[in-house]
């Protein structure tokens, strides 16, 4: 008799995706981050659901409702900090996942890659709107500054901003709609994840060598399920440590001050995971130029497959490209640091230099080095 997991209409889909899925035998720990992101999404949806049961999306009570969750709800403090720091873990895994794709040439699976970019935008939008909900000083002013950027769009900009605000400033209508979208978007993200996996399973996984691995495949279960579970344990240990020992380490102290439209904080900045893009935005003195640079800092990922001119897919055997890749990583760390600094000398010039380097490495230096490597290998 055939096993039920192979015949049942629903179970056989799960079986072909997570049990009998043929996977390359050489996948390293860098391939763990996809499953870790799935766990992060699950944790965020679950904790968010319970938080939404106690949260009120009204400017008069939003801040107090978060205080009530932390003080009066059973384990409310744990839910709140798991959700806030879970977002940080989500972005750490997300950036490592994208970095893995860039390093090993996974972007040549263009459908999977493009859905991934859509997912990145959706998760960033969700995180931004979530940051507004506690209605602290940084929530209010962050929302004001970032939504105001849309006014740089010619002709329709001002009307667009007022339409998003639901009035002439960030107020009750803005908070209510942000809560609605913050609740809805994770489910859209979950649907996009299904599409992401669907396209991935059409081609099969890439591997560290970048060489087709069809002759050497192993079943996903038990080999990679055990490996993924180890990843879950490490990540959940790190998240628990962060939540239980220093829950406010990655947050901003200004967000413990209730939102006040009459008092601007000295340094308005987003959460740490957006600081690199914020630094790129600030490094251009022109408003529209800054907004375009901000969007392009993420959208540039979509043109990476077009710029792939190397005869080898992975960077595993390309030391010159590896040097450039790690230079790009250090530039991103520099931008993240600059994004959290005030706009003054020498931070302005460091930010501008790092921004130019960021685009230069991806658009010019990477393809140029790939061509040089091709010549060195007489290809």
From Swiss-Prot:
InterPro entries reported in the protein's UniProt record = Cyt_b/b6_C, Cyt_b/b6_C_sf, Cyt_b/b6_N, Cytb/b6-like_sf, Cytochrome_b, Cytochrome_b_C_euk/bac, Cytochrome_b_N_euk/bac, Di-haem_cyt_TM
Q: Summarize where heme b b562 binds, as residue positions.
A: 83, 182
Q: Which GO terms are recorded in the biological process aspect for this UniProt protein?
A: mitochondrial electron transport, ubiquinol to cytochrome c
Could you say which cofactors this protein requires?
A: heme b
How is this protein annotated for GO cellular component? Answer: mitochondrial inner membrane; respiratory chain complex III
Describe the function of this protein.
Component of the ubiquinol-cytochrome c reductase complex (complex III or cytochrome b-c1 complex) that is part of the mitochondrial respiratory chain. The b-c1 complex mediates electron transfer from ubiquinol to cytochrome c. Contributes to the generation of a proton gradient across the mitochondrial membrane that is then used for ATP synthesis.
What is the protein name given in its UniProt record? Answer: Cytochrome b
Source organism of this protein record: Mesophylla macconnelli (MacConnell's bat)
